[in-house]
Amino acid sequence: MKKLYTTGWSDYELIDAGGGKKLERWGEIITIRPEIQAYFKSAKPVAEWLKIAHWEFIETGAQASVWKPIKIDAPVAWSIQYGDLVFQLKLTKFKHVGLFPEQRTNWDFIHAHLNPSAKFMNLFAYTGAASLVAKKTGAETIHVDSVKQLISWASENMAASRLDAIKWVHEDALKFAAREVNRGNQYDGIVMDPPAWGIGAKKEKWKLEDKLDDLLHNAKQLIKQKGFLILNTYSPKVDGKTVALLAKKYFGDRNFEVSELWMRTTTGKELYYGNVLRVYTA
């Protein structure tokens, strides 16, 4: 399968990885986080990592974890930029800081394929990086997420980036997509970044392998003939072959490609970040 390499930028650097961890720079703040794909030996010894890192996320048990400060007065919240966009970052209890920088390649794709007359929808939109990129082009932008706190975070990112008029939808993404199909609405661009698993507001279980067919069924009806779709998958139970088969089922009459998403560290290691489906017009 094709490897799609994404890259960092001035405010983000994947410095090194190995031993089940990765070393990253976010602006001036450096973190150490767990990384299941970093099953190899790191280029630099961990002792070297600890000399420059500000925070390390440590898993102390099956359900317990903590951010350990390495430098005195290390900030728990800060911001970085991507071009004119500003992303507010902060330490969360789930090891994340509010941004998936490997998505940079998809942000660039969105920017290249939208214009001010376009209509764009971001499903499972998290803190809204793709929404900001879309809005920056002037496109009408709809941001859908089931977690209210994440929508608030995305709104802060919008304000910090001096943008406005993103439409916020606090709802289950799959249910909202199905309703949009029933309404007959269509989009010039759609991004879907569904979690591998989760538990909904009403305690319903979410497993990507059980929902992927429905997601793509809806997406087929929601994207315009000359529109595009980006789907990211991270689940070990949904491999590239599965995504390709479903893509052929729903988009066999269009151009599409399924790729493995990778990023190289500054030290020359390579990390795998799941699979990406892109449906587009050549």
What are these regions (language model features)?
Residues 228-282:
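C-terminal catalytic and target-recognition region of SAM-dependent MTase-like enzymes
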Residues 101-116:
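Conserved alpha-helix/loop element of class I SAM-dependent methyltransferases that forms part
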Residues 127-139:
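Conserved SAM-binding loop of SAM-dependent methyltransferases across substrates and taxa
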Residues 146-191:
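S-adenosyl-L-methionine
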Residues 140-145:
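Conserved SAM-binding motif I beta-strand of class I
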Residues 8-24, 31-99, 108:
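Non-catalytic substrate-recognition/targeting regions of SAM-dependent transferases
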Residues 173-252:
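S-adenosylmethionine
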